Amino acid sequence: MRNLWSRKVILLIVSVMFFSMVVSSYAEKEIHWTMFTAGTGVSWADKQWKNIIIPDIERITNGRLKIDLLYRGEHPYKDADLLRVVSEGTADLVSGWVANWSGTEPRLTIVDLPMFVPSYPGDLQRVYHRILDEVLKDVFAKWNVHELLTTWMGAQHFYLSDFWIEDFNSLKGKKIRTFNPELDDLVKLLNGTPVRVDAAEVYTALQTGVADGLITGVSNGHDNMYFEVVPNMEATFICDCTAPVYINNNSWDGLPEDMQNALQKYFDSKREWYGMGQTLQNGLDLIDSFPKFNLKVHPMSKDLRKEIVEKSYEAIWKPWIERCGEGGEDVFKGVADILKNEGFEVPGF
C-alpha cells in the first residue's frame, strides 16, 4: 500500500514538472514575423527599423519575437499591394506610403489628399490621430489592421527640369510623373499631362524626357539623385507623404499578453521620435542639395496657390469622394470638421 502511494506521489510530481515544462516552453517559444517595406533601405525610416527598432524589439522580448525585414525588390509585391498583403496576413507588418494605396482603399488617402490636409511641418501631426480614431476606425476594421507607428516623408512639391509654374498654363505640354489619381487630377488642373513611371525607372524617365518633372519630397529626390536632372524645386506644399507601419490584427492578437504590453509601451515611447525623424532629415537633405545638385527653390506664388486650393474641391476632392464610393463623403466631411475645429481653412466646402 505504501509503495502504491509512493508511486502516485512520484507520478503526480512528474506530471506537474512535465506540465510546467510545456507551459514554459510555450511561453518562451520564438515568434517570427515578416515585414515588407515599400522602401529600398535608404530612407530614414528603413534605417531606423533595421538598426534600432527591430533590435530593440528582440531585446525587450528577450529574443522571443524575431522580425524578418524585406525591402522592395526582396519581396514580390508592388507598393500598391502592401495594404492587401498585410490585411491577408501574407506579411505581419508593412511599411509603405498611404498615397500609393489609393487604388486599394482611397479612404485611407484622405490624410494625403492634395491641397486639403495641411502639409507644413507639424500641421498634419496635430490632427492625424484624431482622423484615424474618429473617422477611419471602421476602415481599419475592414482591412483587419491597425497603425503601430507613422513617419512623414515631408511636404510634396513639384520638381522641374528647366521651368517654373507661374500660372495655369505653365504645365501645358509638360509631362509630370505622379503616383496616384489625386495627383493626376492636380496636374490636369494645371493643364499638364500626368505620367506613371515605375519607381525604379524614374531617374531614367526624367533624364530622357519621358517626364519633364515629378511630384515628390526632398529626401526622396535627394537620395535617388533626381535633383541631378530636375533641379528646379517649385515649393508648392501639395500634401504630406504619410508613411505608416500597419500590423495585421491577428498577428498582434496572437502575441502573449506580456509581450503585447511591453511592445505597446515601446511603440508609444517612440511615436514622437519616429513621427518627426524623416521631417528633420528632409531639412538636412535640403541643405545638402544646394551644393550637391545646385538645387534652386522657387516658392509658388500665394495667389496662384490660393486659386488652386479654391478649385480643388471640384477638380480633386470631389472626384476622390466619388472614387471612394459609399462612405467617401462621410470621411471627407469628418476630416473637414476636424480641420476646421483645429483652426485650418477648408475652402470650397
Residue locations for each model-derived region?
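N-terminal secretory/targeting leader peptides
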Residues: A27-D123, D138-F349
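Bacterial N-terminal signal peptides that target proteins for export
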Residues: R2-L12
